[in-house]
């Protein structure tokens, strides 16, 4: 986009100036549709999500066999939901605003196998591809015990095929670990933002890591081009994959089960707010789709992005989606939240979910560091900077009168609200790297 086009855009969408100044902001979505209308625009259904859940159940015996850390949950890749009352109290003191309701942390940061939310979508898509190949070759039937996949004959079969992906880090880690375990050849195309330890981990598993000096968008595009040259290569497209999206969506059904176990009520008088860090959009978009299916109108899904990389907010706010990048408005797309360092949002997710997502806000890197230090201090939970982005959500909701009025959220309803911050990564961060994060946060 040229300067004239951007100036015209700013006249129509004044919030762009706030984004250009790297200021923190909250924008609630005035274009929310009634739930059934909005869900229909996604072009995926609850049945699709249930089929994804069934596929994960078929693979559970195999996962339990090859990843001992999943045995306690019988091969289910799921994270804990924990109340963080001390963190809530600390945030209230920090913001001089009593945050009402109950604050919970969804610890996808500590998901088994790869320690991030990407263990949902990334691993699911690899499993779906492996199942398809094995069934087509007559090696597997749906009714089989999938633990049979842990044999040299299957690893030899899968080694004929390659899987490729472009990533800022965590998606590549999830796909690389799972693909290598099955026997696939794997190439992960990584952007300049990717942490060195993630590259080292992948290489230790025999994964081909291709590094780029550019950002996420270039890594994805180059990965896609390379995959097109090899008929035996399957490219996992983080920007457009409905399979990835469905892998994430299963989380909505799972959270509902956890709520039932903990007897957490969600209805018109007991609203649920879920705050999700957003990069390209597949993870939070898929999870939000699952949440809307599970909890209906009573769940509010709010995305959090770095002030340097607000690609989804920019795309949805202007209606341009993947036709505009943060670079077009002069932002540098450089952030400590490496998992969120994405300049151009997924057009598929933006268009599919634009009538379902309730709000978007941006957050400074300095604030992310403060939040990971506070979470460590109050709850002894360690996450990476991007995973803390959702922590400011309750404050924005409760201090935005227009949002509360739009959704008829009275003070009494907020007293009975449940707030879930979705922690997206950090479980596999080496201890010395985590200490660097915490030391840096104490200096600032």
From Swiss-Prot:
Gene for this chain: dsdA
Supply the source organism for this entry.
Acinetobacter baumannii (strain ACICU)
Entry EC no(s): 4.3.1.18
Disulphide connectivity of cysteines: none
Which Gene Ontology terms describe the biological processes this protein takes part in? D-serine catabolic process; isoleucine biosynthetic process
UniProt-recorded name of the protein: Probable D-serine dehydratase
Q: What is the lineage of its organism?
A: Bacteria, Pseudomonadati, Pseudomonadota, Gammaproteobacteria, Moraxellales
Report the GO molecular function annotations.
D-serine ammonia-lyase activity; hydro-lyase activity; pyridoxal phosphate binding
UniProt-listed InterPro entries: D_Ser_am_lyase, Ser/Thr_Dehydratase, Ser/Thr_deHydtase_PyrdxlP-BS, TrpB-like_PALP, TrpB-like_PALP_sf
User: Which Pfam families does this entry report, sorted A to Z?
Assistant: PALP (PF00291)
């Amino acid at each position: 986009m040229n300067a004239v086009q951007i100036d015209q855009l700013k006249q129509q969408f004044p919030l762009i100036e706030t984004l250009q100044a790297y200021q923190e902001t909250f924008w609630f979505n005035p274009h929310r549709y009634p739930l059934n209308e909005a869900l229909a625009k996604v072009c995926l259904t609850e049945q699709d999500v249930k089929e994804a859940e069934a596929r994960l159940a078929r693979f559970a015996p195999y996962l339990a066999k090859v990843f001992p850390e999943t045995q306690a949950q019988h091969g289910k890749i799921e994270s804990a939901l924990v109340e963080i009352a001390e963190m809530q109290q600390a945030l209230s003191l920090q913001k001089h605003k009593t945050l009402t309701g109950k604050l919970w942390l969804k610890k996808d940061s500590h998901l088994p196998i790869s320690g991030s939310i990407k263990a949902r979508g990334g691993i699911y898509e690899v499993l779906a591809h492996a199942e398809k190949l094995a069934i087509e070759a007559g090696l597997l039937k749906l009714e089989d015990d999938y633990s049979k996949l842990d044999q040299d004959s299957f690893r030899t079969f899968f080694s004929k095929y390659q899987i490729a992906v472009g990533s800022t880090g965590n998606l590549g880690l999830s796909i690389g670990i799972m693909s290598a375990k099955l026997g696939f050849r794997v190439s992960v195309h990584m952007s300049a933002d990717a942490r060195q330890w993630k590259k080292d981990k992948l290489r230790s598993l025999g994964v081909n890591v291709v590094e780029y000096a550019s950002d996420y968008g270039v890594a994805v595009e180059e990965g896609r081009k390379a995959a097109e040259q090899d008929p035996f290569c399957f490219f996992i497209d983080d920007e457009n994959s409905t399979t990835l999206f469905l892998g994430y969506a299963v989380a909505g059904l799972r959270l509902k089960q956890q709520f039932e176990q903990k007897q957490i009520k969600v209805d018109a008088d007991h609203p649920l707010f879920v705050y999700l860090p957003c990069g390209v959009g597949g993870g939070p978009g898929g999870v939000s789709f699952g949440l809307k299916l599970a909890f209906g109108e009573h769940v509010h899904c709010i995305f959090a992005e770095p002030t340097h990389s607000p690609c989804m907010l920019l795309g949805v706010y202007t209606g341009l989606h993947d036709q505009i990048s943060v670079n077009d408005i002069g932002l540098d797309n450089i952030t400590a939240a490496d998992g969120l360092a994405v300049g151009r949002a997924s057009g598929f997710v933006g268009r599919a979910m634009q009538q379902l997502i309730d709000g978007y806000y941006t957050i400074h890197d300095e604030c992310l560091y403060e939040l990971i230090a506070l979470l460590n201090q109050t709850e002894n939970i360690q996450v990476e900077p991007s995973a803390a982005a959702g922590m400011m959500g309750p404050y924005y909701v409760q201090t935005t009168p227009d949002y509360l009025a739009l959704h008829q959220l009275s003070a009494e309803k907020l007293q009975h609200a449940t707030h879930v911050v979705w922690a997206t990564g950090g479980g596999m961060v080496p201890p010395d790297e985590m200490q660097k994060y915490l030391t840096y946060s104490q200096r600032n």
